[in-house]
Amino acid sequence: MSLDSLKSRIPDYAKDLKLNLGSVIGNSGLPAQQLWGTVLSTAIASRSAIVLRELEPEAKANLSPEAYTAAKAAAAVMAMNNVFYRTRHLLSDHEYGNLRAGLRMNVIGNPGVDKVDFEFWSFAVSAINGCGMCLDSTKQVLRKAGVERRSSRRRSDCRGTQAVAATLDAEAFS
């Protein structure tokens, strides 16, 4: 199970996805923790058993136990936050924006890894889940930490996992 195995499953009509996945993951130039934490958290966020099954072992092999757990925690907490804050944002009754969230999010304050790495993973998951408020929030944390826009986008750029997940899941029903 690996990136190469996942790429081999992508059908010919989605060759662009195969090439993009290879360049985004295979040639990122990122430190292993940033890259593989993003790969793991976005594979989880893609909700595709195929993608997760193929990428998780390689991510686990390239991450410390703490980073592996933190990447999974980023996917978990952002799945909750993305739904809550996206709903709050989409409601036409803006009074909902004044209500307390009442959600436990302790892992955000103490993720067990470098805070910037955790925020990158959260940013990538929020992009997949389509939560603009969460994207803005994580972007602000990254900018305050001195991360430039280009660097932030590049480090959290695993959008290919979502496209591959959708394609392979559709192929499973063909």
Swiss-Prot record:
It is an enzyme of class 1 (oxidoreductase). It catalyses: N(6)-[(R)-dihydrolipoyl]-L-lysyl-[lipoyl-carrier protein] + a hydroperoxide = N(6)-[(R)-lipoyl]-L-lysyl-[lipoyl-carrier protein] + an alcohol + H2O. Pfam families: CMD (PF02627). One of its GO terms (molecular function) is hydroperoxide reductase activity. GO terms for biological process: cell redox homeostasis; response to oxidative stress. Gene3D superfamilies: AhpD-like. The keyword DNA repair does not apply. The active site is at C131 (proton donor), C134 (cysteine sulfenic acid (-soh) intermediate). Disulfide bonds join C131-C134. Transmembrane segments: none annotated. Its EC number is 1.11.1.28. It comes from the Bacteria. Keywords: Antioxidant, Disulfide bond, Oxidoreductase, Peroxidase, Redox-active center. Belongs to the AhpD family. HAMAP family: AhpD. PANTHER family: ALKYL HYDROPEROXIDE REDUCTASE AHPD (PTHR33930:SF7). Homotrimer. Antioxidant protein with alkyl hydroperoxidase activity. Required for the reduction of the AhpC active site cysteine residues and for the regeneration of the AhpC enzyme activity. This is Alkyl hydroperoxide reductase AhpD. The gene is ahpD.
